[in-house]
A protein has these predicted regions:
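Exported/periplasmic ABC-transporter solute-binding proteins
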Residues: 1-183
């Protein structure tokens, strides 16, 4: 098992929402139904619409593992009716509501379907920037791995490919593709 790239789990709101930062605890409270109004997190006096992804999605699994941990989520007010590969529909459904919050992986939200009408929130005062993810300052992140069968020979094509992914050129391709370099 070899780490090859990183990605951040991000929260986003409409660009006109005044909120810039939330703590992990505030996000857990929003998604567990304990915080229901933006005024409770120093925002405007308006109800929060907390979108959730489908229960069988990779993104929802990330939400449960990285963010909610052992805390229960409330049933969704609104669900992002999308598979992981169709997040553009999610964002287009979401954009025009200033009181909404949603989540995704940075790669999906920022690279595949970049949308100028959303902004990413800082979590615990740390923005989900490339450098903050690479340096481990932004904590909500995942690592992608290459899994190779044990006993693969050093001069095999598999080993050569893995070495190419790990070298400077390979990691630059990782970055150009929209992920965060691991090395």
């Amino acid at each position: 098992i070899t780490p090859i790239a990183k990605d951040a789990f991000v929260f986003f709101v409409n660009k006109d929402n005044t909120i810039e930062n939330l703590t992990l605890e505030q996000i857990q409270q929003i998604y567990s139904g304990k915080i229901k109004n933006w005024r409770n997190v120093e925002g405007p006096n308006i109800e929060i619409i907390a979108y959730q992804c489908p229960t069988n999605s990779f993104t929802q699994a990330g939400m449960l593992k990285l963010v909610m941990k052992d805390k229960m989520m409330t049933p969704p007010q609104d669900s992002l009716n999308s598979s992981n590969g169709n997040i553009v529909d999610v964002i287009s459904q979401y954009v025009n509501q200033n009181n909404s919050i949603a989540y995704s992986y940075l790669y999906n939200a920022n690279t595949m379907y970049k949308n100028e009408n959303i902004k990413f929130l800082s979590i615990n005062g740390v923005a989900p920037t490339y450098d903050n993810v690479k340096n481990g300052l932004y904590n909500l992140q995942t690592t992608y791995y290459a899994v190779v069968k044990k006993g693969v020979q050093e001069n095999s094509n598999v080993s050569k490919l893995l070495n190419e992914i790990k070298n400077e050129k390979g990691q630059e391709i990782v970055r150009e593709a929209g992920y965060v370099q691991n090395y």
